[in-house]
A protein has these predicted regions:
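C-terminal catalytic "cap/lid" subdomain
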Residues: 1-173
């Protein structure tokens, strides 16, 4: 449908759209929750075969660490898709981790830009590695580490399935 819409407006260079609304399988209008606009942007970018998707935020979370704890932290200049996804799942809140997949699958770089510091140039997320050993530090509160050890009476796949069954029962990840 997007290609049909664009074909009707060939002379238009810029399209503005919302990012939080969608339709579900029942054709009902739904709200995508926080970060849904990031996902919409990369899905639209993939559909259009964009050269790059820019995500703007007013958050200063594009730093190497939390500015509430470290004075004047440096900006993260470049991350691979895998690094960005791991940081997001571990508490780095500069963007929605679900926006990575459409960009990664279509090899479309994502540029995170901070509206509070537009001159900084932002953070480029792509398939490329920068060679730096440490990119950023992030943390989440109330995380628990659980170590499982099998007594070998169950086959490994049965053991693991019982663990995940327990997580599912309590809606935990």
């Amino acid at each position: 449908k997007l290609h049909l819409l664009l074909a009707e407006h060939k002379s238009t260079n810029v399209f503005l759209t919302q990012g939080h609304l969608c339709r579900n399988a029942y054709n009902e209008t739904c709200y995508l929750k926080q970060g849904g606009d990031d996902v919409s942007a990369t899905l639209i970018g993939a559909a259009l075969q964009a050269q790059e998707v820019c995500l703007w935020t007013d958050s200063k979370e594009l730093h190497r660490c939390d500015p509430r704890f470290v004075k004047h932290p440096a900006m993260v200049k470049q991350l691979s898709f895998d690094e960005a996804e791991q940081l997001a799942y571990c508490g780095w809140t500069g963007f929605n981790p679900h926006c990575i997949l459409p960009a990664r699958e279509n090899n479309i770089p994502i540029r995170l830009l901070c509206s509070m510091e537009p001159a900084e140039g932002g953070t480029l997320i792509s398939n490329s590695q920068s060679g730096e050993n440490i990119k950023a530090i992030t943390a989440r509160d109330n995380i628990y580490y659980i170590k499982f050890q099998s007594n070998r009476t169950l086959r490994p796949y049965l053991f693991i399935s019982k663990i995940f069954d327990t997580f599912a029962k309590y809606h935990t990840s």
